[in-house]
Amino acid sequence: YVFHAAAYKHVSILEENIFEAVENNFYGTKNLVDIATERNIERFCFVSTDKAVNPKTIMGCSKRLAELYIQSVYNDLSEKKLTCPKFSIVRFGNVFNSSGSVIPLFNQQISMGGPVTVTSKDVERYFMSITEAVNLILQSTELSNDCSIFVLDMGSPIKIIDLARRLIRLSGLSEKNNENPEGDIEIKITDSIDHCFLYDNDGPKIVSTSPWTGNHEVSAATEEFSVVLD
């Protein structure tokens, strides 16, 4: 089995590093898929992102392109009646307390006396636990027989500013603001996020989609990308 979870995932950084995003998130995936196909790997699970739904960011686009390549390979091999790994694609939301997520960052800022920095008072994100993420990977890997995309029901989105306030309270401290000027930790709004990044893409949550049945334009696009990156 192959579980492919490696990727560049920081949205703001990838907006300024487009080639690196495509080279790592797309071509890194392509290389693994090609090797898995050549070596007759039984199952291949690709960890994607909910930002691949109607992608508005470079990160989302790079992951969506990787999804399309996997589906293109599956369709091509299936049409030719050739041996093919059983591909599955899982779209993650934000994983609570994972490396690089906001929770370790906020906890670090709180431990240093603040401020806790939030990009916008309106920004919202869907979250899932580490256990939910692991179960999604394992179950989708076993269930998929046709390169389906699996998405976990993550409930309602959480406002990041509310999450910051909860973490401050859980630390036994209080928020410092106009209503409580003697509080312990200030929340600073940086206003450093584009409006289109405020909300995670909303779509059906715990579903398995039908496999993509498009044509072979992905292969042509891949070759064009190769020329540009070289």
Locate the predicted segments by residue.
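Short, solvent-exposed loop/linker segments at the N-terminal edge
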Residues: 213-222
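A conserved pocket-lining segment of Rossmann-fold NAD(P)-dependent short-chain dehydrogenase/reductase
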Residues: 82, 105-128, 132, 136-160, ...
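Mid/C-terminal beta-alpha module of Rossmann-like enzyme folds, strongest
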Residues: 143-194, 201
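Conserved Rossmann-fold NAD(P)-dependent oxidoreductase catalytic core, especially the SDR/UDP-sugar
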Residues: 4, 8-68, 72, 78
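Proline/serine/threonine-rich low-complexity linkers at boundaries of modular beta-sandwich domains
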Residues: 196-210
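Rossmann-like NAD(H)/NADP(H) cofactor-binding core
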Residues: 86-91, 95
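A short glycine/threonine-centered beta-strand motif
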Residues: 222-230
